[in-house]
Amino acid sequence: MQVTKRIVGVGHCCQDSICIVEQYPPEDGSTHILSIDDSQGGGAVATALVAAARLGADTALIANLGNDATGDRILAGFAEAGVSTETVTRIPGGRSSSSMVMVNPENGSRTKFPYRDNLPPIDFTREKRSLIEKAGALHLDGTNYANALAAAQIAKAAGVPVSLDACSRQKDNALNLRLAEMADILITNAVYPQAVTGCATREEALLKLAGMGHKQVALTTLGKDGVLAVVSGKVEHIPAFTVQAVDTTGAGDVFHGAFLTAWLEGNDLHACIRFAAAVSALKCLKPGGRSGIPTRAEAEAFLAQHS
């Protein structure tokens, strides 16, 4: 079986409406919308694949989408980015996912209001299974647990590394731990480690997660506060690049795509983190999850300026 360096993603994809507001309103309050941009797609795995493709990686998505206008727009975004969607199935009568995102212009923070799809689980046909089995890495986000677990099982049986964006959590914590254990590359958000392990500190929780399964990478992203990385059995803090963030929507998703791109190219852990942090920082300079994703040349120029 020929193995490629392709990043195959199974996870959430949606269409975002980015609303920049004067200030985030209190409950039962109001605020003015300064601008609306509904041209960009979103979703953790989806945006990671777009970022990787923009950086030159070979990428493909396995997903279900509704046979609706929203699904058309989501697919158009992938086509523009160069992400293969040959294994995306359109579901007649299905509703594709969309999301309203409020952005605070003072600090670039975002609050999401997802409108979930009503789509059935993915049917992992022979074609889809083969795509995973030949991948350089499988990237998951766990939003749809059944889809993520099925894909992870296919990858593990074929010896394909599993990358998990550990941000979504199931109510049954045993399910979270099962998926986390299957991940070879585990990159969490700031909340996930303590939430699923019950450990008192983030560092202790990350070490516990790193000990589950056969981890090659265990990281926690902290936004402007950098990254925690397990290195030789100890937690190391790696600072972020300082930028004036316009919008942090998709910053973590982009980090994943950039990290996997660098990792599949054979770079060491610190180089992968530094590259991903640079790409993520540049993304934050423009509104939306994708408009600010840099090209490889732009990312390398930024790194050269901050060496």
Where are these regions (language model features)?
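Conserved phosphate-binding/catalytic region of the ribokinase-like
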Residues: 1-8, 33, 202-307
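Conserved phosphate/ATP/ADP-binding segment of small-molecule kinases
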Residues: 154-163, 168-237
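Glycine-rich phosphate/adenosyl-contacting loop at the front of the ribokinase-like
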Residues: 1-64, 69-76, 80, 244-245
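A glycine-rich helix N-cap at a beta->alpha junction
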Residues: 79-93
